[in-house]
């Protein structure tokens, strides 16, 4: 037993160039996962909006575990490929498959033990720092209590031990099915270029074009959410197809160009790429996809976090947002003075005063707009939230003195691109558009609508009768409401609003409305949930972006190291026939520049076309600040490009060190 343990440890030590990054990957994955599950298990009340924060963190931990499974399997394949010759020699020298299996068991036990112990220790060590960072991001109070989650430790230990067990089973199956000759040849065996390259390339182009078309043509946020994951799958498939088949096609075209191919700096690099292009293309595609994930995730979550106040103020434009819903026109058209007086009394009893009052009545319904005709939305076509506001309420709210004859409407351009000269109700009257207004935006719950909104200023509420008749014929109704919002003369602490509580108590006692329902939304009460959700998304975005970036770096490193060992013999031969070290460096730069920056360029292209998608998805969070999203996207790409270039310089030097004779054979 000691012999097998010694051989396993000796194998890890001799292949430290490959094993150290693998072990660091395991340690990092385990520590990141433990931190997420430990944060999701913080005591109740520690985080604002703890329900949504826990859901986000648990979802993130699941994504991280699945990603860890794929990444550890991927990196372990490089180790096994490098160790195959060693296992073949053991077999030739008299060791049976069972003996090799015992060595593999010890290697997995050692590497898994180091990863689990180191990862849990690092996770516990950094757990408090991560907790303080999360609490700061969500705007919660911090404490100095050091917590260790026993449940998080057990869950992390069980799930990641399962990953290493699966890796062991995969290695045993691979070695068990191979002969000594196959193991000996596998390390140096080239790969045949895939067949039907043009067909695969064309399929990849079509898939990518389809995904890009969806990204730039979808207008509705809900439709963007529906099609987003389909577009992501299309982009992933297209990226793999283009890198695998397109790289082969590119190499063949370069080989057919004698002036390019038969140069010292190009001959070795291009010829070696052809024999491993399937694996090389898959690695480049993985780097591209990881880079795109980092860019999209970091730019969107950063935009959400720094735009949280804008989003909060869009959803809750006043400190207190009161909406009364009426069952019919008579109650909506009645005297609203008692409601205003009761609200003012509640504010006064709380020791505060109201300011910046904003109020209006409205009648709304979900319809379909096509060629200037409004019809009931019965599940077909894109929905449009149509809202009618009487001119008197608009003039009072905006301080204007507009006039409007019967049969005409003003169109508010907020969130709608309607440019027609008239609007016709299905089987109803036609309204002429008297003009476009720019300075009126929805408030209260109306601001949370994620469908296209069409706000119409009508002469009076009688115009809504025609709308109600059209909707009633389709067995659909309208919503009649009155919005009353105001700011308070001093800022309230988060999650505490005595004014909102007083108004709710009055509504529950039946002293405010005889007919209808009254709803109260407080900015102070909801601020904690907003910052809790957005802050935790930003925290998760940073954590996963770091993880995905390290994964991309790891793939680049293993790609360079493994290809360096494969190319070592080729460059050794070329040196013997006259190639200098300067020629080797020039050839290496030619090879790396040929394929290395393609993932970065394509990731940038993916990000550019994903921008409209991301923008529409952020509208679901009431974030309309396009300029902020442009800024975070640009900064994210520049930062990732700098990191990518640094990794390129470091790994190209490691590759050169190996092929020029500095690495072990």
Feature roles, as predicted:
Residues 19-23, 58, 153-158, 198-202, ...:
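Hydrophobic alpha-helical transmembrane segments
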Residues 1-30, 193-198, 207, 242-291, ...:
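N-terminal Sec/SRP start-transfer signal
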Residues 110-254:
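Hydrophobic alpha-helical segments
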Residues 38-50, 120-152, 209-226, 599-662:
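Short helix-loop junctions at transmembrane helix boundaries
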Residues 312-550:
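Basic-flanked hydrophobic alpha-helices used for secretion and membrane insertion
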Residues 17-45, 52-88, 108-122, 236, ...:
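Hydrophobic alpha-helical transmembrane segments of multi-pass inner-membrane transport and secretion
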Residues 1-6, 177-191, 565-566, 656-665:
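Short cytosolic juxtamembrane segments of multi-pass membrane proteins
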């Amino acid at each position: 037993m000691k012999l097998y343990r010694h051989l396993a440890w000796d194998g890890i030590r001799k292949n430290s160039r490959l094993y150290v990054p693998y072990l660091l990957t395991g340690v990092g994955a385990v520590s990141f996962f433990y931190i997420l599950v430990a944060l999701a298990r913080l005591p109740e009340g520690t985080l604002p909006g703890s329900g949504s924060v826990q859901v986000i963190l648990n979802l993130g931990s699941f994504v991280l575990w699945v990603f860890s499974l794929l990444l550890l399997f991927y990196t372990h394949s490089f180790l096994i490929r490098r160790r195959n010759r060693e296992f073949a020699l053991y077999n030739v020298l008299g060791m049976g498959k069972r003996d090799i299996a015992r060595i593999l068991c010890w290697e997995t036990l050692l590497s898994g033990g180091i990863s689990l112990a180191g990862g849990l220790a690092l996770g516990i060590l950094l757990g408090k720092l991560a907790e303080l960072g999360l609490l700061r991001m969500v705007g919660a109070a911090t404490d100095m209590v050091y917590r260790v989650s026993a449940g998080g430790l057990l869950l992390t230990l069980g799930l990641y031990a399962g990953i290493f067990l699966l890796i062991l089973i995969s290695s045993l199956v691979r070695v068990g099915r191979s002969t000594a000759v196959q193991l000996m040849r596998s390390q140096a065996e080239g790969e045949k270029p895939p067949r039907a390259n043009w067909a695969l390339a064309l399929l990849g182009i079509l898939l990518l074009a389809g995904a890009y078309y969806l990204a730039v043509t979808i207008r509705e946020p809900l439709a963007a959410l529906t099609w987003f994951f389909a577009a992501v799958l299309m982009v992933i498939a297209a990226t793999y197809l283009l890198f695998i088949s397109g790289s082969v096609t590119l190499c063949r075209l370069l080989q057919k160009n004698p002036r390019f191919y038969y140069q010292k700096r190009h001959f070795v690099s291009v010829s070696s790429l052809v024999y491993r292009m399937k694996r090389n293309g898959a690695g480049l595609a993985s780097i591209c996809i990881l880079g795109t994930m980092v860019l999209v995730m970091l730019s969107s979550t950063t935009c959400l976090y720094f735009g949280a106040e804008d989003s909060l103020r869009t959803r809750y434009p006043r400190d207190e947002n009161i909406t009364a819903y009426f069952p019919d026109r008579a109650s909506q058209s009645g005297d609203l003075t008692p409601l205003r007086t009761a609200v003012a009394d509640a504010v006064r009893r709380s020791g505060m005063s109201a300011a910046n009052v904003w109020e209006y009545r409205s009648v709304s319904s979900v319809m379909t707009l096509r060629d200037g005709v409004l019809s009931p939305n019965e599940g077909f076509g894109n929905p449009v939230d149509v809202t009618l506001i009487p001119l008197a309420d608009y003039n009072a709210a905006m301080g204007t003195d507009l006039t409007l004859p019967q049969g005409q409407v003003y169109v508010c351009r907020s969130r709608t691109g309607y440019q027609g000269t008239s609007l016709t109700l299905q089987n109803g009257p036609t309204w002429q558009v008297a003009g476009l207004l720019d300075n009126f935006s929805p408030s209260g719950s109306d601001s949370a609508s994620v469908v296209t909104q069409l706000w119409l200023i009508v002469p009076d509420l009688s115009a809504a009768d025609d709308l109600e008749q059209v909707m009633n014929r389709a067995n659909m109704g309208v919503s009649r409401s009155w919005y009353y919002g105001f700011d308070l003369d001093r800022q309230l602490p988060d999650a505490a609003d005595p004014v909102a509580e007083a108004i709710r108590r009055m509504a529950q006692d039946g002293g405010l409305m005889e007919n209808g329902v009254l709803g109260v939304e407080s900015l102070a009460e909801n601020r904690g949930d907003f910052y809790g959700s957005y802050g935790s998304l930003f925290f998760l975005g940073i954590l996963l972006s770091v993880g995905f970036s390290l994964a991309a770096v790891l793939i680049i490193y293993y790609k360079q190291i493994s290809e360096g060992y494969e190319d070592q013999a080729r460059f050794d031969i070329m040196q013997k026939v006259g190639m200098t070290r300067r020629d080797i460096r020039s050839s290496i730069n030619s090879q790396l520049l040929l394929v290395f920056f393609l993932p970065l360029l394509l990731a940038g292209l993916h990000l550019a076309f994903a921008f409209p998608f991301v923008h529409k998805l952020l509208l679901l969070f009431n974030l309309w600040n396009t300029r902020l999203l442009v800024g975070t996207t640009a900064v994210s790409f520049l930062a990732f490009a700098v990191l990518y270039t640094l990794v390129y310089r470091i790994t190209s030097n490691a590759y050169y060190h190996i092929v020029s004779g500095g690495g072990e054979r």
